[in-house]
Every structure is written in C-alpha cells, then in structure tokens.
Amino acid sequence: MTKPSILVMAGGTGGHIFPGLAVAEYLRICGWNVSWLGNQSGMEYRLVKSCNFPFEAVEFGGLRGKGIKAKLMLPINLARACHQSWKIMRRLKPNVVLGMGGYITFPGGLISKLLKRPLVLHEANSVAGSANRALAKIAMRTLTGFPNTMENAEWVGNPIRQEFDDIAAPAERYEQRQGPLSLLVVGGSLGAAALNENIPAALALIPLEQRPTVIHQAGDKHLLDLQKRYADLGVLADIRPFIEDMPTAYAQADLVICRSGAMTVSELAACGVASCLIPFPHAIDDHQTANAQFLSDADAAVFLPQKNLNPQDLALMIQNLTRTDLKEMAVRAHALSKPHATQRVAEVCADCAGVGI
C-alpha cells in the first residue's frame, strides 16, 4: 500500500517553521511521506535538513522593506518560483499541500490549485500574513493559531512540542512554592537591547529581600554585555546564551518577561505560566501586539508596550505581583491553550487528502 504524502511549505521565521516541523514529525510517525518546500537561503533549510526531511528548494522572497528593484522584478521572480513549484509537485504528487506561512508558500499555493492538489493553510499569528491572506481564497481549509484571525477558519492553536503540554498544571506548580519569586527573561533576537537595558535596572531598584531570582536568556551576541550590566548594577543573575530545555524553564518560573511571538505566546499558554509581554514594536503588521493581547485581554498576562518600558514602572509591577496573583494569571493562560493543535492540523490534512492518519 502506497504511503500518503504531504508537501509542507513554510519559511522565513521560526514562527512559521517550527509549527510546520511539529506537524511534519507527527505525520512522519503516522507513516506519511513528508517533503518540505522552502528557500535554500532561508533559515528553514538548516532546520528542516537537521530533522531529516527531504527539502525541495524554490527561489522566492518577500517584498516588505525591499527597494523598487525587487518590486519590478516580482513578476519574473514569481514566474520562476511557480515553475519550480510546478516541477516539484508534478514529481512528488502530494496527496495534500500544507502552507504554514511565509512568502515562500505563495507560488506553491498557486500551483497546488492548478494541479488540483488540496491546499490547507495554517496562520500562526493573530494578524494573518500576506501570503495566507491571498491563498485563503483558494484553500480547501484554513486553520489559525489564534481566534478571529481569518474568516471561515478553524481556531486550532499553534502546533508546539509535546513537552510543553506535558507540564504539571499551574495551580499544582505554584502552590508548592515558597521564598522569592522566580523570574525568567527571554530576550530573543529581535530588539533585545530594550529588554537587556531595562530589566537589570528594574531589578536593581527592588530591595534585596524582595528581589526575585533571575534566569536571563541573552543569546551569544549579547551575553558578555549583559553579564557586565548585571554585575555593574550589583544584581545576581543566571545569564545564559541559550536555554536548551525551555519547557522546564517555563515550568519553574513564576513570571516570564519576553516578546510575544506566536510560538512564545502559545508555549506560555500551554505551560500555564504568568508573563509580562513586551511586543517587538517593529514586527510586520504589529502582529506581536495582537498576539500579546490574546492573553492580556483575558487577564492571563501583563501587556507592556515597549514605549512604556522603564525601570521604575517595571520594578513596581514586579513588586506588586504576589505569587497568588501569578498563579491565577497562569491558570487563566492555561485555559486558553489548545493542547492538541498538532494532531488537529494533521487530521485536517488527512481529511482533505481523503486518507486516514
């Protein structure tokens, strides 16, 4: 019996790639043949190859922030990408095509329609990206990571690693804790300077007996500067370039201060952990603000725009939050999670392909 096959399309950012990899791995375990369409010069190439999925390269990029030359070349570049996608799909003959977002999905989505291959879309952010908005008109099914993102779409949540869903319930975790609060800071790569500048200064304003313990993920690029800043301010902190086991780090934290990318917000909800979300202000379509408000509107997180970020107010916020407050916030966040998102996306793909998982 021939195995069912899927072509996953995603690229550009981790918010598109990582949920695609979660679905790809799930379907591979279920016995599907999985291939990936992406840009060989994008971050998806390294990530997908490291997971041992066949990679099909298409040359196509976005227009936002590009000059007039890129816009003038769009028809030629799109035609080339469509031709490449056509050859790939004619050869692979996938039972279903899954677009997870990013400009690279646009030519492949068009060709899936021409070749009468079922197209399923998944939008990770609270604000739909350009490619998904355009392709939604021809997709068989549209799925979203957040509610009320696109018309005629099913809110399934964002596919994440199973380890995030396996953590003990927040009420159980928080009730067992005593002593100073545990603070986890995830600086990320986008605009980390604002967090790295203000958070150590805020902690220095908190009296020693009230000061939380701190783990700060800095990234390799900012590690030495951040170590010096904490030391100069006399604040003891565990500063790491990277946290390998993020589910455990979330589970052990009382409060997380971080950006609000789609996957981060979904992981916070899955784990059930209180957070202070500081959206990256220059994200496309300001989607990080909308992502953060998904939790903050339900009193499941503190929403702090970067323009309002300063050490004095941040220190006051941390001091005013009790562990009981944080537990209640974490419980509300957990109630918004979609623990079976990966399975649901896979089920929809199988349904559109007319086969079982």
Curated annotation (Swiss-Prot):
Enumerate the Pfam families for this protein: Glyco_tran_28_C, Glyco_transf_28
Q: Which GO terms describe its cellular component?
A: plasma membrane
Sorted alphabetically, which Gene3D superfamilies does this protein's record hold?
Glycogen Phosphorylase B (3.40.50.2000)
So which residues are the signal peptide here?
A: none
Q: Where does UDP-N-acetyl-alpha-D-glucosamine bind?
A: T13, G14, G15, N125, R161, S189, I243, Q288
Q: Into which family does the record put it?
A: Belongs to the glycosyltransferase 28 family. MurG subfamily.
Q: What is this protein called?
A: UDP-N-acetylglucosamine--N-acetylmuramyl-(pentapeptide) pyrophosphoryl-undecaprenol N-acetylglucosamine transferase
Q: Which organism is it from?
A: Polynucleobacter asymbioticus (strain DSM 18221 / CIP 109841 / QLW-P1DMWA-1)
